[in-house]
């Protein structure tokens, strides 16, 4: 934070750069500050260009494959940022800031595949594949902040921000195959537009009070409101290279709508008594999820749509951090936290994707978050030029989200989805040693031993029981990093690592 009694004035900078591949960048920024007002503005431009070439030869007992691929990519991005802070009084600040990004990118790849028959009864053939894509990206972010400072160590902070990400892309895939001795071409044309439209609101209210040198309290409220609406489309043509007779692939179509609202309250208390320090906290979260998934028929006929899938949750997340200063250079730490990992939107989409002829993939709207308890015990020892940190940790997890695959007993097809299937346990020991020698050499050595166990499970799905065997593994690794300093040169690093797993 800038001091409020500084002298008023302007300052700014301008820079530009380029590289040998045809890329370029430039930026300009200006700042103004005074006792009453602070302001800044920035604009930047970046141009990317990349040309690549790939060549490969592969052999098998049926065909030998050879190809030479040409790849071209370029993109332009424009970035702008601006902000304003008004010092309404010695204790009150109001800020408004925002950021915009507008970008466009294109790529092209042409790959001629040549297949030479090795086995009897097969014919040589050639397949040309052309892939083109273009993408328009727009990002917007804005933030309002108000802070009231009772004292330097006692304040109330309120923030509201809004962000939006919108992307419109076009992807074209063209295949042309011709067999030796036959001039008739087989075509496979696909056009897949991609439209992403996400937005999010966040509201935060934070209170902090350093009551004494050894005592501090914090409390706050946070709310997030996110919305995602992403359709999936495809147009196909098997009669021409240009796709002049392309029709919509109705089986591929899907619109997925995902909304999540979250409200959280938290409080924490920090206290130090002699050599003993403690921080205890509690966070309560309530959130609700709403998902909708439409096929092509449901998109065009609302009467066919199923009811949106809705679910809400309330959970408490305690935390406790304790430390004890054994001596001036030795400290013990004991920590505990309860955590969660939520499923991401795509894992909740019930649409059955049949693009892969061997496996039907789909999401599971019934998924719940994973919950884990994390325990750690740390010992820290410091010397003037050296330090040693030894950490032991243990983390049991419930409702583990696992990707499972199974063969349906009715239609004989393979399916893949995500389920909350079992419990897991993670434990380990980590050692970190830092050494400084003669002011010119820094060494960091770390070693980690890690054990993971996943319980077996039996889960009913599609009228049958899907089972999974218990699994466990032990892994260890060690790493050393060196940083050397010379009087007239920059530091350089030489990493070395060893890894082993069972």
Indicate residue ranges for each PLM-predicted region.
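Membrane-proximal, glycine/serine-rich, low-complexity loop/turn segments characteristic
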Residues: 1-116, 129-168, 206-228, 268-270, ...
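Surface-exposed loop/turn segments flanking beta-strands in extracellular/periplasmic regions
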Residues: 51-66, 114-127, 174-189, 227-255, ...
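Short, catalytically relevant binding-site loops at active-site mouths
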Residues: 450-453, 498-502
């Amino acid at each position: 934070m800038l001091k409020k009694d500084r002298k008023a004035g302007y300052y700014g900078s301008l820079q530009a750069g380029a590289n040998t591949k045809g890329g370029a960048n430039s930026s300009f920024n200006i700042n103004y500050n005074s006792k009453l007002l602070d302001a800044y503005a920035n604009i930047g431009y970046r141009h990317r260009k990349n040309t690549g070439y790939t060549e490969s030869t592969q052999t098998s007992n049926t065909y030998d494959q050879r190809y030479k691929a040409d790849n071209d990519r370029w993109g332009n991005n424009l970035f702008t940022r601006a902000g304003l802070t008004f010092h309404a009084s010695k204790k009150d600040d109001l800020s408004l800031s925002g950021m915009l990004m507008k970008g466009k990118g294109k790529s092209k790849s042409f790959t001629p595949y040549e297949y030479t028959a090795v086995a009897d009864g097969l014919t040589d053939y050639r397949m040309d594949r052309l892939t083109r894509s273009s993408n328009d990206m727009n990002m917007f972010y804005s933030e309002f902040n108000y802070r009231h400072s009772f004292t330097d160590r006692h304040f109330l902070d309120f923030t509201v921000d809004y962000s939006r990400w919108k992307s419109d892309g076009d992807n074209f895939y063209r295949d042309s195959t011709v067999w030796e001795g036959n001039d008739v071409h087989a075509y496979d044309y696909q056009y897949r537009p991609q439209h992403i439209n996400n937005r999010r609101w966040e509201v935060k209210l934070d209170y902090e009070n350093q009551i004494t040198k050894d005592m501090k309290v914090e409390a706050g409220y946070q709310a997030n409101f996110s919305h995602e609406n992403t359709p999936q489309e495809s147009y196909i043509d098997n009669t021409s290279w240009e796709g002049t007779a392309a029709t919509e692939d109705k089986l591929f179509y899907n619109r997925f709508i995902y909304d999540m609202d979250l409200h959280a309250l938290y409080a924490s208390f920090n206290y130090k008594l002699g050599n003993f320090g403690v921080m205890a906290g509690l966070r309560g979260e309530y959130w609700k999820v709403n998902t909708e998934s439409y096929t092509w028929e449901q998109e065009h006929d609302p009467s066919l749509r199923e009811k949106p899938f809705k679910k809400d949750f309330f959970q408490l997340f305690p935390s406790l951090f304790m430390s004890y200063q054994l001596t001036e250079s030795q400290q013990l730490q004991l920590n505990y936290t309860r955590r969660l990992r939520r499923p991401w939107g795509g894992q909740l989409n019930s649409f059955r994707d049949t693009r892969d002829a061997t496996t039907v993939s789909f999401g599971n709207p019934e998924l719940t978050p994973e919950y884990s308890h994390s325990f750690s015990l740390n010992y820290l020892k410091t010397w003037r030029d050296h330090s040693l940190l030894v950490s032991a940790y243990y983390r049991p997890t419930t409702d583990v989200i696992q990707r499972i695959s199974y063969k349906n007993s009715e239609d004989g097809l393979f399916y893949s989805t995500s389920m909350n299937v079992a419990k897991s346990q993670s434990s380990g020991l980590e050692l970190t040693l830092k050494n400084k020698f003669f002011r010119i050499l820094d060494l960091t050595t770390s070693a980690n031993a890690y054990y993971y166990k996943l319980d077996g499970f039996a889960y009913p799905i599609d009228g049958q029981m899907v089972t999974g065997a218990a699994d466990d593994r032990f892994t260890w690794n060690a790493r050393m990093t060196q940083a050397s300093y010379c009087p007239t040169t920059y530091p350089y690093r030489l990493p070395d690592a060893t890894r082993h797993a069972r």
